[in-house]
Structure formats: C-alpha cells, structure tokens
C-alpha cells in the first residue's frame, strides 16, 4: 500500500517483486503534520496490507492510512518504514492505531520508547551499510547490492 502518491513507484516495484496487488491511499494534506484520507484506490477488504514509506515523522499520515484500511475491512495492517524519525506524538499514535506491526530500520538511532514499543520492530541495516562503504572504498559496484 502506498500511503500517498509520492511512494507509488517504490510500492509498485515491491508489489511486483513479491507478486501481490497494489493499493494507493489518496490523501489531502491540509497543513504540515495534518492529512486526511480521501479515498483508497484498490481492493483491501480481507487482505493483509503493508504500508510502505521512506520516512515516518509524527505518524499522522501512517496511522490515518491504517485506520482507513481497517475501515475498508483490511484483515491486517503492517508498515515498513525505512527511516523512523518518530517525533512526538508518533509513538502514542502508533500504539493507539490499528497497525499490527511496524518495521523500521536502524538508519536513525532509535530512542528507548521506540525500542520498548510492542508494535515496532527494528531491522538492522548496519551490515548492508558496512558492505556499501567497503565497496565504495574498493571502487566496486554498490548497485549490485540492491538488484
């Protein structure tokens, strides 16, 4: 699930790679940190949904999208976020939301409240970053790591 049109290309590539359907959240942003889900494009009823995004700051868009998916009878809602900034009130929003599990990377050092959340799992990308740095140092291809 793409939580907004800005992530559609990445979400489509992931959906193709894992052979699943794509849905898009059509949202309206009234001002910074305030968004409203206008429509869901695609079928989500009785499906396990995975929200894909590059960054999550206050979790407003993410939790609104999760609520909209559940209101359309999604079976479950997971989120994969590359960079979990998770500024206040993100943790509180996530804990109160219908998100079953949120996966973030350790690209940003997680605070204790993030580490202690039952809904958030941290996936280490340290080995990948280390390998990329090593390849750059040795003038080897980095793009093959992501093929």
What are these regions (language model features)?
Residues 1-147:
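PRPP-associated nucleotide enzymes
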């Amino acid at each position: 699930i793409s939580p907004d049109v800005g992530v559609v290309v990445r979400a489509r590539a992931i959906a193709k790679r894992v052979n699943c359907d794509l849905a898009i959240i059509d949202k309206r942003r009234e001002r910074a940190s305030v968004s409203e889900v206008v429509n869901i494009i695609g079928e989500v009823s009785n499906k396990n949904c995975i929200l894909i995004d590059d960054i999550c700051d206050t979790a407003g868009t993410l939790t609104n999208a999760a609520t909209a998916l559940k209101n359309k009878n999604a079976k479950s809602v997971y989120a994969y976020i590359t960079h979990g900034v998770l500024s206040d009130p993100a943790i509180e929003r996530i804990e109160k939301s219908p998100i079953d599990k949120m996966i973030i990377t350790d690209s940003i050092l997680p605070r204790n409240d993030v580490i202690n959340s039952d809904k958030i799992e941290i996936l280490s990308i340290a080995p990948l970053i280390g390998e990329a740095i090593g390849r750059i140092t040795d003038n080897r291809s980095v793009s093959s790591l992501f093929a």
